[in-house]
Amino acid sequence: MARGARPARGPAGVLQAPGVHRGDPGVHRGARSRLWGVRRGAGSRSFSAWSSACAGDPRRRGGEDMEVKDANAALLSNYEVFQLLTDLKEQRKESGKNKHSSGQQNLNTITYETLKYISKTPCKHQSPEIVREFLTAMKSHKLTKAEKLQLLNHRPVTAVEIQLMVEESEERLTEEQIEALLHTVTSILPAGPEAEQQQNASDDVAMDEEDPA
Amino acid sequence: MFVLVEMVDTVRIPPWQFERKLNDSIDEELNKKLANKVMYNVGLCICLFDITKLEDAYVFPGDGASHTKVHFRYVVFHPFLDEILIGKIKGCSPEGVHVSLGFFDDILIPPESLQQPAKFDEAEQVWVWEYETEEGAHDLYMDIGEEVRFRVVDESFVDTSPTGPSSAEAASSSEELPKKEAPYTLMGSISEPGLGLLSWWTSS
């Protein structure tokens, strides 16, 4: 086989299993099981070569190790994770049968606990429109991405909380600005489950639909 | 609190699952492998976000299963430094206050990062903030089950993968591994105004 585009194939090609070889696995298209049938006599050799290739030098194991391409590709708000987990739960409920297999137990545990945690925060009542409105309103305050994310996740109602989340807030924000920021946050973001009782005292027109009797 | 991590991995689908849609099988396999597990230097993996690319699937000699290289994004719990989080007190010990988020338990607030002055009440095994006002000292107890707001000041990853046979001599000298280390721990601090039990700071 003199096709230059396939470096793994050569006189000793049968001993190197495709895909295990470092290099471009895309060179091989699809399962080549029929080729192995052709080389009958070499069958046993190729098997042992493959298993030794796998068990041996990790450098030769090409695409078989898990690799992290970017450990910080994007920050997610609690609302986005809440949405994702709720959708996942719905999907799994519909497909029914294999939820309880031992392999799925970890996923069940982590989704249940994380959902439980986020449901107790104000993020539960948010929506994509609210988040968009919030971020547009935040543009004028000149905060960093991390600060805006914390405000979105926690919905602070007091000045002391703002000071915790915004770095060097005494230097960057005056008292009126902090008040304005608080007002934006509390008016755009809906209150959390426990904060509803505390909201009664304030004169903000409540965004939440539930009636806290 | 949560970040998206882009990863690449080879997923093995056994032949008896070939009738299922490949995407569903891969989703399940990835979640089975990563959900609720801590990845070294990455964080606690929660669930799969999406699959960005599927490369060709190969069948290797001697193994009937298909192997597919998958590029995907995973939701990982990995708070950034100085992030404010709210958790529940799980317990107190002389090492500090242990806080839990429900899905993540290994958060410690060491004694020096508590609101000062603080003392450990041996009888009740609880940390106390001795808050001074003009009236006198109030003892504010940090009881179990209370919600606290804290700042993440440090994180540490421990590689808990099993050691090879070469260290067997060292391991056999001690009966068992001394203690099970948590693969991912966070250090918190509540020494600023606004931090600590939520009940301390709600205006009444």
Curated annotation (Swiss-Prot), chain B:
Major localization class: nucleus
Protein name: DNA-directed RNA polymerase III subunit RPC8
GO-annotated cellular components: RNA polymerase III complex
GO annotation terms (biological process): defense response to virus; innate immune response; transcription initiation at RNA polymerase III promoter
Subunit note: Component of the RNA polymerase III complex consisting of 17 subunits: a ten-subunit horseshoe-shaped catalytic core composed of POLR3A/RPC1, POLR3B/RPC2, POLR1C/RPAC1, POLR1D/RPAC2, POLR3K/RPC10, POLR2E/RPABC1, POLR2F/RPABC2, POLR2H/RPABC3, POLR2K/RPABC4 and POLR2L/RPABC5; a mobile stalk composed of two subunits POLR3H/RPC8 and CRCP/RPC9, protruding from the core and functioning primarily in transcription initiation; and additional subunits homologous to general transcription factors of the RNA polymerase II machinery, POLR3C/RPC3-POLR3F/RPC6-POLR3G/RPC7 heterotrimer required for transcription initiation and POLR3D/RPC4-POLR3E/RPC5 heterodimer involved in both transcription initiation and termination.
InterPro entries per UniProt: NA-bd_OB-fold (IPR012340), RNA_pol_III_Rbc25 (IPR013238), RNA_pol_Rpb7-like_N_sf (IPR036898), RNAP_E/RPC8 (IPR004519), Rpb7-like (IPR045113), Rpb7-like_N (IPR005576)
Compartment list: Nucleus
Cross-referenced Pfam families: RNA_pol_Rbc25 (PF08292), SHS2_Rpb7-N (PF03876)
Biased amino acid composition, Low complexity: 166-175
Molecular function terms, GO-annotated: DNA binding; DNA-directed RNA polymerase activity
Family statement drawn from the similarity comment of this UniProt entry: Belongs to the eukaryotic RPB7/RPC8 RNA polymerase subunit family.
Family annotation (CDD domains): RNAP_III_Rpc25_N (cd04330)
Region of interest called Disordered, as start-end residue ranges on this chain: 158-178
Function noted in UniProt: DNA-dependent RNA polymerase catalyzes the transcription of DNA into RNA using the four ribonucleoside triphosphates as substrates. Specific peripheric component of RNA polymerase III (Pol III) which synthesizes small non-coding RNAs including 5S rRNA, snRNAs, tRNAs and miRNAs from at least 500 distinct genomic loci. With CRCP/RPC9 forms a mobile stalk that protrudes from Pol III core and functions primarily in transcription initiation. Pol III plays a key role in sensing and limiting infection by intracellular bacteria and DNA viruses.
Alphabetical keyword list: Antiviral defense, DNA-directed RNA polymerase, Immunity, Innate immunity, Nucleus, Transcription
